[in-house]
Amino acid sequence: AKQGCNVVVNYCHGATAAAETAALCKELGVEAVTVQADVSTAEGCKKLFEEAVNAFGRVDILVNNAGVTRDNLILRLSEEDFDTVLNANLKGAFLCCKEAARRMVRQRSGRIINLSSVVALRGNAGQANYAASKAGLIGLTKSLAKELAGRNITVNAVAPGLIETDMTAALPEAVRTGMLHSIPAGRAGKPEDVANAAAFFAAEQSSYLTGQVLCVDGGMAM
């Protein structure tokens, strides 16, 4: 929104948060709409993109940032929790990429940014499902980058480390302290750090970058 882009805010359950996000976008002088849709289903993705096109006429930028966790050690990790995470984090991104690519190929332009994670590169005990989903996003990113580059469409990934969010705030103090010790910068990042990376990949300045994974992690993945 700060770069002058109209915004479509997708949500599945968080209507209030989506409305607040849209309101913040409008305060910056752009148009914004919210769309309730489950992106882990083809029907939900189709609805999302149809409403986006109805609102603004085209889709120029896709940011796949849906993410859920269902943490547990492998011996306790249920098939249901594995499927829930893979469906939301990886299948949903695949379906959204497919809908976006269909339109961007016709436009001969577009930007796709996938939100991965440093756990895709490092692994993390108790997060086999989450790490697998985020590692899958990197493979998806690189494959689609090769498929779509000839149509002036870039596909890149941002891999955040420990970021100050509601989800990380709920971590036990011992876990949080251990994670901070593994970060050379010695601190957690801010949501703005991730947003700035995504905005860079969406901008004209990054038009010759595709298939890249940018770690926003204070050196955690080195």
Where are these regions (language model features)?
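Short-chain dehydrogenase/reductase
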Residues: 1-56, 70, 79-81
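Residue(s) in the substrate-gating loop at a strand-loop-helix junction
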Residues: 117
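Substrate-binding pocket helix/loop in short-chain dehydrogenase/reductase
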Residues: 45, 73-74, 78-86, 168, ...
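Catalytic Tyr-X3-Lys loop
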Residues: 68, 75-94, 109, 113, ...
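Alpha-helical segment proximal to the catalytic Tyr-Lys
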Residues: 102, 146-150, 207
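Active-site helix of classical SDR
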Residues: 97, 133, 141
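Active-site loop immediately N-terminal to the catalytic Tyr-X3-Lys motif
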Residues: 75, 122-128, 150-151, 186, ...
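C-terminal substrate-recognition "lid" of short-chain dehydrogenase/reductases
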Residues: 109, 153, 187-216, 221
